[in-house]
Every structure is written in C-alpha cells, then in structure tokens.
From Swiss-Prot:
InterPro entries: MINAR1-like (IPR039706), MINAR1-like_C (IPR009626). Belongs to the MINAR family. Its main location: membrane. One of its GO terms (molecular function) is cholesterol binding. Disulfide bonds: none annotated. The chain crosses the membrane at residues 100-120. Highly expressed in the auditory hair cells. This is Major intrinsically disordered NOTCH2-binding receptor 1-like.
Amino acid sequence: MFEDKELEKHITPQTLKPKIKQNPLYSHINIIQTEENKSKPSWTIQDYDRHTSHGQLADYMKEDPRDLSFWLEDLYTPGYDSLLKKKAAEMKRNKICKTFAFITLFVCAVVIIITVPIVVKQSRD
C-alpha cells in the first residue's frame, strides 16, 4: 500500500529547489522581485515605438490580424505559393464533385418520381 507518510521524509527544502537556480550556466540571472515591478511597466508606448520595426504603434494596431499579409509581412516560406495553389485546386475539385453529386441525386429523384407512378399504373391495368 502506498501512503503519503512514506514520502514526507523525502520532501525537504533541497528537493523543492528548482534545478535551474543551481545550474552554473544560469547563475548570472538575477531573481527579480515581481511585487516591486508590478506597478512599473517595463515598456512604455514610446519605448515600444523606438524598439520595434513597425515604427508607430498606433499605425501597427490599425492593421487587421485576419489579413494574411499581417502574419506574413517579412516572412517568405519556400513553396507556400504552390501550397496555396494546391489548396485552391482541391477546393475547386471538391466544389465540382459536390455539384455533380447533387445533379446526379436530383436526376435520380426525378426519374424515380416519374417511373414509380407509371409502373404502378401499368401493374393495376
């Protein structure tokens, strides 16, 4: 039977310390007191405007994130154009297939509606 009492002996402040604080590669990182920095923003709008590639934050915020150029502004992915062409061709094929299936179903329904009464009428005579 597994009980928590067995684990209580092994939980010490040393085992609760994060490994990153003990790692010498990260020893230069100072621990920032979050309580002191909550009231002071790390970036103001003017600082953000100076450091970003977009220049004016207000102009940048006017852009529509639903626009594809918003996300792919300076990014070029090789083969992206061909991928878009393949997707467009696939959507066109799907639309044609759906239209053809609808027309076929409609024709079958019309044929059944016309032939069933004729067959029933002939079988009565």
